[in-house]
Design a protein with these regions (language model features):
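Active-site-adjacent alpha/beta core region of enzyme catalytic domains
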Residues: 41, 116-246, 299-340
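Positively charged n-region of N-terminal signal peptides that target proteins for export
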Residues: 1-4
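Non-Sec secretion/translocation targeting segments of pathogen effectors
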Residues: 19-28
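Terminal low-complexity/disordered tails
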Residues: 234-239, 245-307, 328-352
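A short, basic/flexible loop-to-alpha-helix module at the beginning of a structural domain
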Residues: 30-34
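Patatin-like phospholipase
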Residues: 35-43, 48-136, 164-177, 181-188
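Bacterial N-terminal signal peptides
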Residues: 7-18
């Protein structure tokens, strides 16, 4: 019995000496260090012919020095076009004055032509313009040519209505679908392909996604394309100091019939009389995805700001003949306005 007690005592002493030598018993497992917080990210939603509204807000952000440390951009549809323009401007390849001149010089015929009253329209003029401006003037041929990491959202037409539909085509490999070697014009044509109105587009040489037709990413789950930011943060192990979500104004009255008339379709005002308003739906979707961001990434939401015009004038979504007036109206409105913190925006339910 004494021998057993002595052996047990020696074992306990040895264990104590070992613990002391190793610094004592280990405490709770340490949490991994928080990723560094730095840089600014932009999220630019779709806008169709209201593209100059977003451009004017982006110029105002730049003038106020809020894009000095711009590190990532995510956009879809017209927001994708503005994302590429910001790349050109921040890198010194183009000025805001030149970009505004391009927008103000556009007309419907520079974007689409229509045979009779058939939909979708022919967007070959848009492709020609993008090749001239994006490839020729800005010097961007592939996604990898963009100096700022940039994601452009697209979706498959057959996937519309499903939950997971977005493909976030980034200039850097942050996800499975990104391929920096792809044509930037092809991706822009897909991202601006408004379902029904504009034809779906195919992207040449794809290997990371199916070789099929694609449409506007904003028509799927990326109505507010913020998730690319989460993917970029995870891939680069960082957190952005600030995020600005820039969008366009939503009109407050039904204008479906007027939009259709611009495309040669006369519904005799039926949709407007019924009060059918895609604008109200768009506003609800905007708030829905902002609320989703707040729930999904509360830390990021605390550092996110929303800027969306709210002036008196109304402009049609498919009227590319009024871009100059839109730029001027938004620029004037922005002088007395500032981006609103996301949580404040949601609490005030700023839905036009």
């Amino acid at each position: 019995m004494k021998q057993r007690f002595l052996a047990f005592s020696l074992f306990c002493m040895a264990l104590v000496f070992r613990l002391v030598a190793e610094g004592g018993p280990s405490g709770p497992a340490e949490l991994p260090p928080a990723p560094p917080v730095r840089g600014v990210a932009l999220v630019i939603t779709g806008a169709a012919a209201r593209i100059p509204q977003e451009a004017a807000l982006l110029e105002a952000l730049d003038e106020r020095g809020l894009l000095k440390d711009l590190s990532f951009i995510s956009g879809d549809s017209s927001g994708a076009l503005n994302a590429v323009a910001v790349n050109a401007i921040v890198s010194g390849r183009m000025t805001w004055a030149r970009y505004r001149q391009i927008l103000e010089g556009l007309h419907n015929s520079d974007v689409f032509v229509q045979s009779g009253k058939r939909l979708p329209v022919d967007t070959s003029p848009l492709r020609a313009m993008l090749k001239r401006v994006v490839e020729g003037e800005m010097g961007f041929r592939t996604m990898g040519d963009l100096p700022i990491p940039t994601s452009i959202s697209i979706t498959r037409l057959e996937d519309l209505g499903l939950e997971k539909t977005a493909y976030r085509m980034c200039s850097e490999r942050i996800n499975a679908e990104s391929d920096p070697s792809l044509s930037i014009v092809d991706i822009l044509m897909a991202s601006t392909a408004i379902p029904v109105v504009f034809p779906a587009a195919r992207i040449a040489g794809v290997t990371t996604i199916k070789d099929i037709d694609y449409v506007d990413g904003g028509a799927g789950e990326d109505y507010v394309p913020y998730e690319a930011i989460l993917e970029f943060e995870a891939a680069r192990n960082l957190a952005f100091e600030k995020v600005f979500i820039v969008s366009r104004k939503s009109n407050t009255v039904p204008e479906v019939s007027e939009e259709l008339r611009a495309l040669g379709v006369n519904d005799r005002g039926l949709f407007d009389k019924l009060g059918i308003s895609p604008e109200r739906l768009a506003s609800r979707l905007f708030l829905k995805y902002l609320a989703q961001l707040a729930r999904q990434a509360p830390g990021l939401a605390d550092r996110t700001f929303v800027w969306r015009p709210d002036f008196q004038a109304s402009f049609l979504l498919l009227d590319f003949n009024s871009l100059g007036a839109q730029y001027a109206a938004t620029q004037e409105w922005a002088q007395a306005s500032a981006p609103v913190p996301l949580l404040q925006y949601l609490s005030e339910a700023r839905s036009p």
